[in-house]
Swiss-Prot record:
The lineage of its organism: Eukaryota, Viridiplantae, Streptophyta, Embryophyta, Tracheophyta. Disulfide bonds: none annotated. Belongs to the Casparian strip membrane proteins (CASP) family. PANTHER family: CASP-LIKE PROTEIN 5B3, CASP-LIKE PROTEIN 5C1. Homodimer and heterodimers. Keywords: Cell membrane, Membrane, Transmembrane, Transmembrane helix. The chain crosses the membrane at residues 7-29, 49-69, 95-117, 135-155. One of its GO terms (cellular component) is plasma membrane. It comes from the Eukaryota. This is CASP-like protein 5C1. It is a multi-pass membrane protein. Residues 30-48, 118-134 are extracellular. Residues 1-6, 70-94, 156-159 are cytoplasmic.
């Protein structure tokens, strides 16, 4: 499976340039989601928003750590191929993908409810920020799901 990647790994598997791009995107979108949600001090009033902040706070260090591993693997040319470590990465990616999707969906549902109430419980400025936060969370989830899929595919193809 040679796709022009120096590491010889799959297109988005840990240790490839594709994985580095996915991880950087995850960190950027998660940080943006956290920033947009944290700008409004009213988010503590809603459990779904607190859940989103917590999950995005977990995704950022996970993605940054794996991005550093990818940088090392891409530039040094020493890919991460230890099966036990790859299984941990796959399990972590899958778990964070599921909970980030749940957080994004629950936040979007609460935002929709707040907008249907015509802003009587929240100002339109905060609702706009919350919408941006949920959108960034969905984009982060999309990249996280892609990483989980690529890494699962890589692990399954090695055994």
């Amino acid at each position: 499976m040679d796709n022009g990647d120096r590491s010889g790994a799959g297109a988005g598997a840990v240790g490839s340039a594709g994985s580095l791009g996915l991880r950087v995107g995850q960190a950027v979108f998660s940080s943006a989601s956290l920033l947009f949600m944290s700008v409004g001090v009213e988010f503590f009033s809603y459990t779904a928003f607190c859940f989103l902040v917590t999950i995005m706070g977990l995704v950022i260090p996970w993605s940054c750590t794996l991005a550093m591993i990818d940088v090392y693997s891409v530039f040094v040319g020493c890919p991460l191929r230890v099966p036990g470590v790859m299984v941990i990465v796959v399990v972590g990616d899958c778990a964070l993908s599921i909970v980030s999707f749940a957080a994004a969906c629950s936040s979007a549902a609460v935002i929709d409810l707040l907008l249907q109430l015509h802003g009587s419980h929240s100002s339109p400025t905060f609702c706009g920020r919350y919408q941006l936060s949920a959108m960034m969370a969905f984009l982060s989830w999309l990249l996280m799901a892609a990483s989980a899929t690529f890494n699962l595919w890589f692990v399954a193809s090695r055994w």
